[in-house]
């Protein structure tokens, strides 16, 4: 299994990275985990979008799904689409089709008639125990964020990757990540910020320290930190994580790949 980072900037694109988007290659499977602002362009440096087998969206904030509109245009209007093209499976929160249609609709008046089902085959993450995608298995667990949000686990031939999506401290993330080879985990802010807070606000994001604590509690083999906003220092968040997690840990970088 191989993870390629399309974008890793937290809460929106930054000057050197798109927002969240991750390509997982496992055997013949090509799976996207999120597709935030700017990440569709990055995807095309690594893969023909027609070769995708599925998309899994952790939640529906724009920095994790805005470029689904671009993927729709590519698949619906490309003049040289494959003759065997089928609807692309999208695993996402239940309201994804309505939310994605709202982002794509030409106007508010046309929202009610905007239909994406000719291009995307939506599957509600809450309704599936495990999804099989071209020889990989995808599982999901609810996590703690202001909107409906999921962490995602991808398994293939004994290798396992867990992606936190966006979450505050959450037992569900620990359980889903238990024993995983790699935890790709958000670390959005420092554990303390003088003058702002002495402890992170609950139910939104993880600090670097909290990301490390979740990795340690789950017993993962390796921690990859992501989703660092441009206004915080990723190196400082990584140092926090390393204080509480004694396994390999690093910050991901756009266009970098990691073997699992």
Q: Positions of the model-derived regions?
A:
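Binuclear metal-dependent hydrolase catalytic cores
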Residues: 1-162, 168, 175, 238-260
């Amino acid at each position: 299994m191989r993870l390629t980072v399309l974008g890793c900037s937290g809460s929106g694109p930054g000057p050197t990275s798109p927002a969240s988007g991750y390509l997982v290659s496992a055997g013949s499977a090509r799976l996207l985990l999120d597709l935030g602002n700017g990440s569709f362009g990055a995807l095309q440096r690594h893969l023909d979008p027609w070769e995708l087998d599925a998309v899994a969206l952790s939640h529906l904030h724009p920095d994790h799904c805005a470029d689904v509109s671009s993927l729709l245009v590519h698949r619906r209007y490309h003049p040289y689409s494959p003759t065997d093209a089928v609807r692309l499976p999208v695993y996402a929160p239940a309201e994804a089709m309505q939310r994605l249609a709202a982002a794509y609709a030409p106007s508010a008046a046309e929202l009610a008639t905007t239909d994406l089902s000719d291009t995307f085959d939506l599957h509600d993450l809450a309704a599936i125990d495990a999804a099989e995608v071209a020889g990989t298995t995808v599982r999901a667990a609810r996590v703690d964020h202001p909107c409906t949000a999921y962490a995602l686990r991808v398994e293939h031939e004994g290798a396992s990757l867990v992606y936190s999506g966006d979450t505050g401290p959450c037992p569900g993330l620990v359980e889903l990540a238990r024993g995983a080879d790699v935890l790709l985990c958000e670390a959005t802010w420092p554990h303390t910020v003088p003058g702002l807070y002495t402890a992170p606000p609950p139910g939104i994001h993880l600090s670097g320290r909290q990301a490390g604590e979740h990795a340690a509690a789950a017993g993962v083999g390796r921690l990859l930190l992501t989703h660092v906003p441009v206004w915080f220092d990723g190196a400082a968040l990584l140092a926090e994580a390393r204080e509480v997690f004694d396994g390999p840990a690093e910050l991901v970088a756009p266009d970098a790949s990691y073997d699992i």
